[in-house]
Structures are given as structure tokens and as C-alpha cells.
Amino acid sequence: MKVLALRHSVTQVYADTQTYLHDDMKDDYENAFLISNLTVHNILYLNYSLKTLEILNKSGIAAVEVQGIEELLALIRCNFTYDYLNNVVFLHDYSYYTNNEIRTDQHWITKTDIENYLLPGWKLTYVGYNGKSTRGHYNFSFTCQNAATDDDIIIEYIYSNELDFQNFMLSKIKERMTTALPIARLSNRVFRDKLFQSLSLNNDKIVNVGPRNESMFTFLKFPSIKQFSDGPYLVKDTIKLKQERWLGKRVSQFDIGQYKNMLNVITTIYYYYNLYAEKPIVYMLGSAPSYWIYDIKQYSEFVFETWDPLDTPYSNMHHKELFFEKDTIKLKDNSILYIDIRTDRGDIDWKEWRKIVKEQTLSNLNIAYKYLSTGKSKVCCVKMTAMDIELPISAKLLHHPTTEIRSEFYMIVDLSDFKNIKRFVPKGVLYSFINNITTENVFIQHPFKLRKMKNEYIVALYALSNDFNNRENVIKLINEQEKSLITVRLNNTFKDEPKIGFKNIYDWTFLPTDFNTRNSIITSYDGCIGMFGLSISLSSKPTGNNHIFILNGTDKYEMIDQFANHMGISRRSHQIRFSESATSYSGYIFRDLSNNNFNLIGTNVENSVSGHVYNAIIYFRYNYSFDLKRWIHLHSVDKVKIEGGRYYEHAPIELIYACRSAKEFAKMQDDLTTLRYANEIERYINKVYSIVYADDPNYFIGIKFVSIPYKYDVKVPHLTFGVLHISDNMIPDVISILNQMKVELFKMNITTSYTYMLSDGIHVANVSGVLLTYFKIYNVFYKKQITFGQSRMFIPHITLSFKTNKTIRINITKLKIESIYLRKIKGETVFAMTE
């Protein structure tokens, strides 16, 4: 959903679009709630309130002020992520395909021969980090840039087994044009930047679990963040390999040698970060022209000093000369050294060439060892070739993708590796490594151990659901960790499957009720980003690959109307009720009937069940940004912080009724997951609320009316407005509450319209118009620890006779209250009041 705020209406008609006119009779929160539950994708919001826009954006729903038709067209034709704090729109707009154009935000790609392999007549355009270079395309009242690129396709091609790039690109573009936009993945780059900038301001120690290559630029500016990944491939791990021969396989049609060099250097930088938590000087020998240095500097400033007879235009200091072992004295501490020296083969005979390569490899190793032999805080990444050689057993082997699989690989060596024992590795084993192992991640840090960390803030996005992690340990970590943002896979199966297949692995599935957290927010992607100054135009969909975002230790926990709130909670219900169901009242009717309340007159106005809780349970797959457990808990301990707007607090019994309705709904849908969720929410309600039922009552509150429009033979026809189980010394407290509620009680618009047999031999009249006040007084009694109300549904009625009688229907008739009283069952009236 996207909300586009306009001061004036527009004459054009757009698909999937609705106009909403701000209702001045309602507060900003109610306007925001009504907007959030509209079922179309585009909302044109007229006469808008800035506060309403703020409320929507904090809820993760993109709401942007639009000044003219060009801005409107730009935002209505695509999806986007909105930085509402800085008024920046990040479009995810692929309409540039109509210019026969693909886009990249990696400068090095523009320096390759990739355009020779594009679709006929197509070109490649560099658009800068997150599309920053496109800002000049939009002369708007807000900052706008198009973050959409085709880098995902290019990188997927590089790691695939396909060689024909044109066919691969064509297939992926057609797929992009015929499937739903993976909005969370596109938006995630924007979110990660905001997230870690925000966390770094307030946390000295941050741990990041499971980063992948898509994050390789993000963390360059955060050397102190401790990374955990799948671990490195060590020299000693080659003992498992069988010997092989040279393969000579081409990986990419266009030259990706620069990509390999960039990944090698970035891998070395992160390895250095993990050891020393600071930025190093980057020394490079060879690898000219290294256009990718420009890409790194777009994200974070580094000092590059390079040696190569060829130009290296983006180096801070380039020496257009060869580097020799004796020159290592020029290299300072607190640095990394990348050695990529290799003479071009030219027309040299193969055997002679192999001899030269081996000599250069040994020379490279000598430079590396000489560099590491003195000083401190140093890491070296050195180019190697498959040959019989002795290597440190703890050195890290790299084989990032390159244009052709031949004889080369790379090795990271640090000070401890240099001093470690060496082992002989045969040439055939190294060929086996080169032929079969591709380094898929620039993060080669050791795996994360599932245990609580005392002073660290843990971030684990899409990293802990894999079934090689112990599920109970994942839950334990989330329950115990004081400060963290962790995601787990949402169980949106219908058979309550504990695992779901994903690519070539399995993920554990989770529900919010699996966690016993305190001071944490459990929400969706859009609910989470709202807390970090972002909103999104396309909300989470039940794709089967959805994740719960769990934030521990957030200062926004008690702000239930601002973040991870109830915005959009009825949207799925509206989509069904106003399109597919038997009546738009279907939800109200079902909730009453499933709780044995058969008086459906005015059910849409006076419903006996919390619609919020009911919708949050049965449609949890569609809207899990609303943190239901947090909402329940904060109400139970009376710590709700409401910023503004009219607010209705549910009685705990309303929540129980909602769970009962949700369970019956789940059974009818054969939805085992929702059935478990509803049962667990009901247990949670009973856990946090101390609900005691007056199933053996000794007092009741009665309402006597001036007149009853039916014949009766009971002594005093009255409405039993709830029963109590109290001691006599609590009577003054009950009377005090009745006096406190007197105005509201007498203001009730009570009506009746028919009679019916409540059970055998009990003829009663229906009563409408009292439930809202009943639940309100229930809450007051609950907070005063006075036992009020029974475990069965409260069905308002007036007993007329203890004989069997026919049903009578009359016009809706208002009943005027004569008095309200407290009376002992089978005893005397102890209190009465009149208007």
C-alpha cells in the first residue's frame, strides 16, 4: 500500500486506486487506521494531515506528500522505499527497460566488455550507490532516486553454471516482468544502511550474524562490528580432497577478473576488521587498473597505495613501477597487502610459462612472508598457483569467481599463520580445490555459537532458521538476549509444518508464541523498518518465505500506537468480506455465532468479540506487523503508552472470546497452524491476566426498566448486568465503581426487539446496546481484583417467564432505565441508584 498525499484532486483515473478525503470529525489516528485498511494499492489522500502521514510512515506504510502530476505519476507507477525522516524516495522502478537499458551500481562492470553480450541494441548504465546518480532525473519536492538495478542478475549469472549471458539475462528479465517484485530484498539494502547507522550511535559492541555478499559494501564503514559467517576454507581442509588435473573451464563470457580482485580485497578487509576492529591501509601489488576501487570508495573512504607499471586511476598513491621483496620496508603497520603479481603470458610456450608462474608464486610468497615478519596488525592476500608446495596449515584459501577456472587461487595469511606449521600440499589437491570449490562469500569469519552475549547487540537477519541450528537453542537465544534484532522463518503453512524447504536446505518455522520474550517487539519487515525511519509501498505477502523480526531491548516497546501497531489489521478481512463472502457482515456474524451469541441485531456495532485479536490471529500470514503478544502484555500490566487519538481498551474476556472464534475458524479451514496459534494466544492471555470467573456467584448487578413491552409473569423483570463473587467487605468497592460508572450506565442506548426460549422453560427478551459498557465495567472490576463475569459468554437478556412461550417480534423498542442495583443472589438489595 502506498499513500500519496495531495492538496487537490486529480482528474485522471488510475488502476487499483482510491481517493480518501481526510475526515475532520475524526482524529489523525482514526484517519490513519481507516486509510490503512483500504484494500486498494494506491491511496490518493486529499486534504491530508501531516500527523496522519507520520503515523502511517511509522507503521511502515509509505505515505508521501506529492506536489504535482509528475511526482504522482512517478510514485504511482512503481513501488518504493521511503526514508520519511530525510524525505528521500528510493524507487524500485524497472521501466528503464523501455530504453533498451540495464543498470548497475557497480562501476567496475562498466569497464568490462559486457555490452558485447547484451540484448541487441541494449546498453549498460551506471547509476551509483543505490541509484544516487539518478537524482538528477527527478526535479521533485522530495529527494528521489531509482535504486533498481540488474546487479542481482549479473551476479547470479557469475555464480551460475550458465555461460550464455544474453540468454540468461533475457530469461531473468522475462521472469522479473511476470512475477511479484521481491520488494523486501530490494528494500533491504536501504534498510541495512539505516539499521547499522542507527545501532552504531547507541551501541558500543555490535555482532552481525550471517552476512552475505549483498552486504559486502554496507559494512565497510563499520570496522568494529563483529561478523560471524560460515567460516574459512583452510589449507588443512584440503586433506579431504582427491587429486585432480587442470580443468580450464570458462565461467563468464565477459571479463570478471576485476570482480575477483575486488572480492579478494574486500574479503581481506573484513578478515582484518575481525582481528583488529579498525580500518587498514590497503597496499596492492599488480591488479591494475582496479576500477573497483571507485566502488569501495562510494561506500567508505580507504587509503589505497598501489604498485603496477599500468595505471590505477582511483588509487590514492600509485607507483607506476614494479614492486620487489626489498620494497616491503615501505609498507607500514595497520595494513593489508594484496599481491596479484603475474606476468602476461603472451606467446610464451606453455611449459616455459608454467615455470615462470611457479617462480612468481614463490616470489609472491616471499614478499608476503617478509611483509608479515616485522611490525604488527597486518594481513596479506597473495596470488597462488596449483603446484607442489608447503603452506601454513591455518592459512585461508580463496577461490572467488573469475573469467576462467585455470590454475590460480588466493590465500590469506596473517601473523599467526605465518608462524604456524606448514604442510606439503600436492599440485593435484590444489587443482581439486580450484575445480570444485567456489568462495561464495567475502565474509569468512567463524560460525556463530547460539548463546547469549552480555554486552553486545546481536543482529541476525535471515541467518538462524536453517535446520543445522538447534531450534530450541535459537528460541533460547532470542528469549535471553537483552539487545538484538533477529529474524526467523514464519510458519505460514497450513499443516503446522516444523520445517520448510528453501533452495537446497531446510528452515525451521516459528510463530510469535514460540518466544517468551520481555520488552521485545515481534513484527514483520515493514513493521520493523518503521522503527528505523523507513516505510515501504508494498507490504509483506504470504509467499511462504516470510520472516518474523524480533527486536529485543528497544526503547519503543511501550509505544503500541506508534510502532508495530494495529494499522492494516482489518485489511485482509475487508478484502474477503467485500469481495468473496456471503455478506460484508460475515466476520461479525461468525464471531458472535461461534461464541453462542445468537442475537445478531446490530452485530456490526455491538460485537461480543475483539475483532482486532480475531483478525490478528486468523490472518496472521497477511499482517503480522501488529505485535499481538506485546499488545496483550502491555494491557495486562497497564503500561500502555498512547501518543494520541481515541483509544478503546478491551476487556480480557473479549480476547478470550476472540481466540475461541479463531479456533473454530481454523478448524473449519483445516488450518492446523492457526489452530495452534489461537490456542497458544489464549494460553498467553490466561498467563498474563489473572482471570477469575464468578461461575459460583453470590451477587449480581441488576437493571430495572420503567416498562417492558412484553407480557411477563416474573416478579421483577430485569437485565442481569453481570454476576460477582465477592465477600461482604468488598461491597463498598463495588458500589464505588457503580457510582463511578453511573453516567455511562444510564447513557446506554438499550433496546429490545424479540423474545426467545433461552433454554427449556426460560422465556426471555433480547437486549441490545449494553456490551460496550459491560466490557468497560468488566475492566474496572478486573483492575480492582473483583471477580466479575462468568466463563461462558455474557448474553444480555431479560427473563420474562419460566414457561414455554412462542417467539414474539416487535419493532425495535428503547428501554428506559429506572434503577441500577446490587443484590445478593437469593438475598436483599444492598445498593440501588437512579438517574
From Swiss-Prot:
Contains a bipartite N7-methyltransferase domain, a 2'-O-methyltransferase domain and a GTase/RTPase domain. The C-terminus contains a phosphodiesterase domain that degrades the 5'-triphosphorylated, 2'-5' linked adenylate oligomers produced by the host cell in response to IFN stimulation. It catalyses: a 5'-end diphospho-ribonucleoside in mRNA + GTP + H(+) = a 5'-end (5'-triphosphoguanosine)-ribonucleoside in mRNA + diphosphate; a 5'-end (5'-triphosphoguanosine)-ribonucleoside in mRNA + S-adenosyl-L-methionine = a 5'-end (N(7)-methyl 5'-triphosphoguanosine)-ribonucleoside in mRNA + S-adenosyl-L-homocysteine; 5'-triphosphoadenylyl-(2'->5')-adenylyl-(2'->5')-adenosine + 2 H2O = 2 AMP + ATP + 2 H(+). Interacts with VP1. Interacts with VP2. Disulfide bonds: none annotated. Residues 556-692 are annotated as: GTase/RTPase activity. It comes from Rotavirus A (isolate RVA/Equine/United Kingdom/L338/1988/G13P12[18]) (RV-A). GO terms for biological process: symbiont-mediated suppression of host innate immune response; viral process. Multifunctional enzyme involved in mRNA capping. Catalyzes the formation of the 5' cap structure on the viral plus-strand transcripts. Specifically binds to GTP and displays guanylyltransferase and methyltransferase activities. Has affinity for ssRNA but not for dsRNA. Capping activity is non-specific and caps RNAs that initiate with either a G or an A residue. Together with VP1 polymerase, forms a VP1-VP3 complex positioned near the channels situated at each of the five-fold vertices of the core. It is found in: Virion. CDD domains: capping_2-OMTase_Rotavirus. Residues 693-835 are annotated as: 2'-5'-phosphodiesterase activity. Its EC number is 3.1.4.-, 2.7.7.50, 2.1.1.56. Residues 171-245, 429-555 are annotated as: N7-methyltransferase activity. The active site is at 718 (for 2'-5'-phosphodiesterase activity), 720 (for 2'-5'-phosphodiesterase activity), 797 (for 2'-5'-phosphodiesterase activity), 799 (for 2'-5'-phosphodiesterase activity). This is Protein VP3. GO terms for cellular component: viral nucleocapsid. PROSITE patterns: SAM_MT56_VP3. Keywords: GTP-binding, Host-virus interaction, Hydrolase, Inhibition of host innate immune response by virus, Methyltransferase, mRNA capping, mRNA processing, Multifunctional enzyme, Nucleotide-binding, Nucleotidyltransferase, RNA-binding, S-adenosyl-L-methionine, Transferase, Viral immunoevasion, Virion. Residues 246-428 are annotated as: 2'-O-methyltransferase activity. One of its GO terms (molecular function) is GTP binding. It comes from the Viruses. Belongs to the rotavirus VP3 family. Its main location: virion.
